Design a protein with these regions (language model features):
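Activation-loop N-terminal segment of eukaryotic-like protein kinases
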Residues: 227-230
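Conserved ATP-binding subdomain of kinase catalytic cores across diverse folds
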Residues: 28-168
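Juxta-kinase regulatory segment immediately upstream of eukaryotic protein kinase catalytic domains
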Residues: 1-36
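Catalytic-loop of the protein kinase fold
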Residues: 212-222
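Short, glycine/acidic-enriched loop or turn micro-motifs at the edges of active sites
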Residues: 174, 222, 239
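Conserved protein kinase catalytic core
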Residues: 62-63, 177, 225, 242-244
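C-lobe/activation-segment region of protein kinase-like
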Residues: 233-344
Length: 353
C-alpha cells in the first residue's frame, strides 16, 4: 500500500497547483527560491500549503510545441542514440519524454506498485526559459564532441531559441544518495555497513522494477538518486527511455541491447563511489583498485560490507568503467559490451549465492 502521508500531500498539493492560472502559477515559480541550473533545466523550491515542492523547468523548443508534436515521445530531432550515455554535455531527447516518465512513475506510487520515485504533483507549460547551460554554451565544441552531428546542432539551436519551458512540480526529497553515502561512510564502520546494505538492496530493487516495466533510467548516478534514510528514490528522467515510447527502429535496437544497462551502471557507480569515499582515491588509483579486485585481490582494510561490495561487483565494474572511459575519452560510438556485462551479472549472482 502507498504511504498515506504521501497520498494526502499529493492530493492537497496537486489540487492547489491545478487551481492556479498560468499567469499566477508563473508568478509563484518566478518568486520561488532558486536551487540551481544545469543541462536539464533550472530548479527552484516552492512552498504550497506549507509543503515544499521542487520545481524543475525544462526548456521546451518550438518543434516540441507544434500541435502535431504535443506530448510526443518520438525522438523529434533525430538525436543519435549514443547521446543516451550523457557524457560530455548531451543535448537531451526532449521535454515530453521526461514528462511521460514522470507520469508513469507517479502512477506507480499512486497505484501502490512502487514507492522509490518522487511524485509529480502537477505540470504546466509556462513562458520564459533560461540561457543555454554552461555544458552546451560552446556549441561548436559540443557538436564536435558528438561526432559533428547536424541533429545535435539543430537541437542545441532550438534550445537556444526556445521561449517556453515545461514546469514539473515534484515531491521534494532534499538529500542525494551521494551526499548521504558520504555522511554514512564518515560516521564509522557500523554506519557504513548499514548504508552499503541498504543501497545495494535498493539499487537492485529499483532497477529491477523499472526495467521489468520497460523503462531504462540511463542516468542513475548518485546525484540523481535521492534518499530519506529508509529507501532510495530514482529521480531526474532527462535521459530515460521506455519501450512504450514512439521509438525509431534504431532506438528499439538500442533499447534491446541495453536492457542490462541500469543494473550494471548502478553497481559500477556504487563500486567507484565507495572506493572514493572509503579510501579517498582519485580516478587513476580507483580504476587500478577496481582492476585488482576484479582479478581476485582483496580490497584494502575498511568497513566489512563495503569490502564485500567491492569484491562482489568489481569484475562488472571493471568492464563498465573501461567502457565509459572509452566512450568519454575516445569514441562516442564504442559498442556497449553487452555480452561481457551479461557474464559479469551472472557471476555476480553466483557470488551472492
Amino acid at each position: 500500500m502507498p504511504d498515506s502521508a504521501r497520498l494526502t500531500a499529493y492530493s492537497a498539493v496537486s489540487t492547489s497547483l491545478a487551481l492556479h492560472s498560468d499567469r499566477r502559477l508563473g508568478e509563484l515559480v518566478d518568486a520561488a527560491l532558486p536551487l540551481g541550473s544545469g543541462i536539464g533545466g533550472r530548479s527552484a523550491l516552492l512552498e504550497v500549503g506549507g509543503k515544499p515542492v521542487f520545481v524543475k523547468r525544462v526548456p521546451l523548443t518550438e518543434v516540441e510545441r507544434l500541435p502535431e508534436h504535443a506530448r510526443s515521445t518520438a525522438n523529434l530531432f533525430g538525436i543519435p542514440t549514443f547521446c543516451q550515455y550523457g557524457v560530455g554535455g548531451g543535448p537531451g531527447f526532449g521535454a515530453w519524454r521526461e514528462l511521460a516518465v514522470h507520469t508513469m512513475t507517479t502512477n506507480w506510487v499512486l497505484g501502490g506498485e512502487y514507492e522509490g520515485v518522487p511524485l509529480m504533483y502537477h505540470w504546466r507549460v509556462l513562458p520564459g526559459t533560461a540561457a543555454l547551460p554552461e555544458e552546451l554554451a560552446d556549441v561548436e565544441r559540443v557538436v564536435a564532441y558528438w561526432g559533428g552531428s547536424p541533429d545535435v546542432r539543430r537541437r542545441i539551436d532550438a534550445l537556444q531559441q526556445s521561449t517556453a519551458s515545461l514546469a514539473l512540480f515534484l515531491e521534494y526529497i532534499p538529500r542525494t544518495l551521494d551526499e548521504w553515502l558520504t555522511e554514512q561512510t564518515e560516521a564509522g564502520e557500523e554506519g557504513a555497513d548499514r548504508a552499503c546494505s541498504l543501497v545495494e538492496r535498493e539499487l537492485e530493487a529499483g532497477t529491477s522494477f523499472m526495467n521489468a516495466r520497460g523503462l531504462l533510467h540511463f542516468d542513475a548516478h548518485f546525484q540523481n538518486i535521492l534518499v530519506d534514510g529508509r529507501r532510495l528514490y530514482f529521480a531526474d528522467y532527462g535521459l530515460a527511455i521506455s519501450s512504450r515510447f514512439d521509438l525509431a527502429p534504431s532506438e528499439t535496437g538500442f533499447f534491446e541491447r541495453h536492457r542490462t544497462y541500469d543494473r550494471c551502471y548502478t553497481r559500477s557507480w556504487l563500486v567507484n563511489s565507495l572506493i572514493t569515499k572509503v579510501y579517498g582515491y582519485g580516478r587513476e588509483k580507483r580504476e587500478a583498485l577496481i582492476r585488482a579486485c576484479a582479478a581476485g585481490e582483496e580490497p584494502p582494510d575498511g568497513p566489512q560490507k563495503a569490502r564485500a561490495v567491492l569484491s562482489r561487483h568489481a569484475p562488472l565494474a571493471a568492464v563498465m568503467t573501461d567502457f565509459y572511459v572509452k566512450v568519454q575519452d575516445e569514441d562516442r560510438e564504442t559498442p556497449y559490451p553487452a555480452e561481457a556485462l551479461h557474464r559479469a551479472l551472472q557471476a555476480d549472482r553466483t557470488r551472492r549465492g
